[in-house]
Every structure is written in structure tokens, then in C-alpha cells.
């Protein structure tokens, strides 16, 4: 039970709104964890006892101090677009909505480095960057509704990963403003080295209030659809495109059965294995040549900027899963890095699992090397069948990033990050920030 003294104390904080209606408590205690039947069962009853929405960093400090004083768990929430229960309060307590901290504080005109508050929507941030000829390097497919702080705290990569790798790669996150959960909370300005431990930590070891990020030069991305005569050709062409000397922002590979189930949005109506590409204008002719050489048919849809919300990026990454689940909630998914050569693993798994496994691949840059990751659609047949499938993938050399578990470690490489745990001990010694999500601390 939330102490009355805490409610009274928070009610007196300027620039802080308290939400207490049952509908608000339910709504803001959820994210998109229903992608996973496992998490859906585990998290369905989790509820905050109070939701607060600060408008200033000072209000954040006051909330942190009050929760620490009363020993009440505090869970942070951006837009709630995460898929792993990152912002779900496992131990109830207070959920703090960060969406009102949304100012773009500065953009360096020469370097493009941006300092932005955590609650800024990525679409709004990208719009501000475009005014000075810059753009975000990495985005989730939920970029229109996701906050930049939520992406750093709970995401890992997405659109742009084929060129820029993943968020934890050195060079993306250049600094953080962080409020600690100490007895006397502090506002810290962390440089890149110290900030790294809070990157993809689910808000368990510090409260991110602002970020400093590197950006990229704006490109007028062109949308290309390439229909291939067979699956082997599609996978091979994806490898050729990702290794070509072209500016490539997205390389999605979909087997024909997935293409049939996605919104068509005036795309070519063919039942074929398909590539979805975002490329620079000077790369269109190169992709055309590569496609023609293997008997594939390329369609140039034009500039992405002209698509007005129904572009190819909304068919990629987790939006592929979203669209299929809207048609049939019996689909769930996995995340994995495929072994090389990829086709052997892909075909072996397909032979065993048949139509219960539909292939969706994404080109990524992993530790400086072009690789193919996969977010396959998986027909839900129960937890035991899912575990058997994951073990089969591991046996073939795939690296699984399990989207059906709650902890930072479980969804990653399965090992404890000592720096993340040490940072939690330093900034949240009582373990009140998003408890239960950082396994190394819990254990």
C-alpha cells in the first residue's frame, strides 16, 4: 500500500501531475509486451499504485527523493512502445511518465551533436534535426510515437542499423543527464564513458532526463521494393546490397508468405520473396543492376518523404510483427543473429518447423561486420514448443536475443554486465528503480 505521506508530499510538488484514476493506472502500467504470450501471462496483473507526470527536472528530483525516503519502487515510462515489459512496474509503486520533458536543448551546427530531453518524440526530434540538414542515425519502427529516452533506455537498434550498428556501439551516445536515486538525489552530467552503463538498462540504474547524441547528415531516402524469383536469391541479394558501396538505411528481407499478410499500401502485387530498401538517390541504379543480374524485379517507389506515414520503414523491424499480429494474434516472434552462411540455418529450420516459422530478416552491422539478423514470425504453440525452437536455433549457431523474458540480461547475451550493476549500486543503492529487471542486481 502506498503511504499516504508520499501521496501528500508529491501532491505539493510544483510542475508535477498526479494520475490516480483506475484507467490511468492500468494504461500506464502496460507496454507492448503482448507481442509475447509468455510476458502477457506474467505481466497482466501488474499495476502501479500512482502515476506521476513531471514537467521539469526539479520535479523529477523531488519524486526520486520522496520515493527513496518512503522506500517505494519507481518505474520510468516513455511512450510505452517497448516489447519486453521494460516499463511495467513489477512491484507496483509509482510509475513516472517522462513525456513532458521534451525540449531540444541544442544542436551543434558544425558537428550535428544534439542535446535533447528524454521525453522528446523521435519524430519531433528528427524534424528539428532536418532544419539543419541532420537526421537520427538509428530509429525503431515505432519512431513516430517512441521517445528518445525510452529508445536509449529500452531499445537496441532498428532502422539505420545496417549502416550504424547498435545503440551500445561507441559513438552514438555521447552523454547523459541523470537523476540519481540516492538518499539525496543528484543531477549528474555524465560523459560517454560513464553514460554507457545506463544505455539499454531499462531505467534500472538512473533516471535519464536528457541525452547528448551523434547524428548523421540528412539523406533523401529512396524507397525500393525488389521481388525475387526464390528465397535463396532474396537472401543472396540482401548480402550483395549490404556489402555494396552504397548508402543504405534499411534492408528488410521477407519471405512471400509474410509479404501476403502485410498491408500493401500500393506496393507491387506479387507473391514473391521481397526486399524492402531505403537507399540514397545515387544508389538506385546500383541496386537496379544488382537485382537484374539475379533475375529480380526492382520497383522504385520514389522518395520516402513523399509517402506520408505509409512508408517501407513501417513494414520493417517490429512493425512486421505488429501487422501480422493485427491480422492474427496467434503470431509471436523471436530475435536472433544468424550464423554465416545464413541460408543453411534458414533452410534447416524451415524444413523442421514449416509454416509455423515465417522468415523476416534485417541487414545489420554487428561489431563492424555486415550480418543478417532475423525477427521471424512464430506460430504460438505453447512455451515448450517455443523453447524447443530457440534451442534448435542455438544448435545451428544462431545467437538468440530472447524477447520473452523480463531482465536486461535475459533479453541480451544472457550474461551480467558488471558496469550496469555497479552503476545501480552507486546511483540506486536501495534497488527502487524498476526492481526485478536487472538480474545481476537482483541476484
Residue ranges and their predicted role:
Residues 77-79, 86-93, 99, 143, ...:
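Conserved glycine-rich FAD pyrophosphate-binding loop
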